Swiss-Prot record:
Alphabetical UniProt keywords: Cell inner membrane, Cell membrane, Membrane, NAD, Quinone, Translocase, Transport, Ubiquinone
Signal peptide limits: none
Name of the protein in question: NADH-quinone oxidoreductase subunit C
Keyword Translocase (UniProt): yes
Gene Ontology CC terms, in alphabetical order: plasma membrane
Keyword Cytoplasm: no
Family per record: Belongs to the complex I 30 kDa subunit family.
GO terms for MF: NADH dehydrogenase (ubiquinone) activity; NADH:ubiquinone reductase (non-electrogenic) activity; quinone binding
């Protein structure tokens, strides 16, 4: 049964910090939401604590995704390129938490799988592997889940071309689907210019 009133974010921050101890690199509140950052080395252990600790009891993994922070350097951020972000829900305590863990190696990003804690992480982790190339150590079936068989690359990485590398079409002579280099021609996008304040009746 869920509690009627959600815990205050600042209180949840303190509860999470106390439960994780030195496993938490930081616990912050922004826009009424609590985010905890943990190290890759202690990620699985921290998630187990968040799942079972009496004041946490995050029974549900709502979402898990990869993030590519490579363009954040343009605004002065330094640090690892890839992170895994999870959103947890405690039904019994009516509280939510965001967990972020950075992969230590940009060339071969790896974090532990949390499928042993939440079985529902299975497809989430496969999606993050497929789209970002993040490897989840301990996942027993880490196959692509969205892209085609034989797909090369990871399309949500920010250095992956928007048009992709290949396209597929049906070849009537061979009577099968074939792959070929992308034939989309690059085009320049001209920004819309509003010439007067009430142009198009928008103002």
């Amino acid at each position: 049964m869920m509690t009627a009133i959600a815990i205050h974010p600042e209180v949840l921050r303190d509860v999470v910090a106390a439960a994780l101890g030195d496993k938490a690199r930081s616990v912050t509140v922004a826009l009424g939401e609590v985010t905890v950052e943990v190290s890759a080395a202690q990620y699985l252990e921290a998630m187990q604590v968040l799942h079972t600790a009496p004041d946490c009891r995050f029974e549900v993994l709502v979402d898990l995704c990869g993030v590519d922070y490579s363009t954040y350097a343009e605004v002065g951020r330094e640090g690892p390129r890839f992170a895994v972000v999870s959103h947890l829900l405690s039904i019994s305590l009516n509280q939510r938490l965001r967990v972020r863990v950075f992969c230590t190696d940009d060339d071969f990003p790896v974090v532990a799988s949390v499928t042993s804690v939440w079985a529902g992480a299975n497809w989430f982790e496969r999606e993050a592997f497929d789209l970002f190339g993040i490897v989840f150590d301990g996942h027993d079936d880490l196959r692509r889940i969205l892209t085609d068989y034989g797909f090369i690359g990871h399309p949500f990485r920010k250095d992956f071309p928007l048009s992709g590398h290949v396209e597929m079409r049906y070849d009537p002579e061979q009577q099968r689907v074939v792959y070929q280099p992308v034939t989309i021609e690059p085009r320049e996008i001209t920004p819309r210019i509003i010439r007067e304040d009430n142009y198009g009746g928008l103002h």
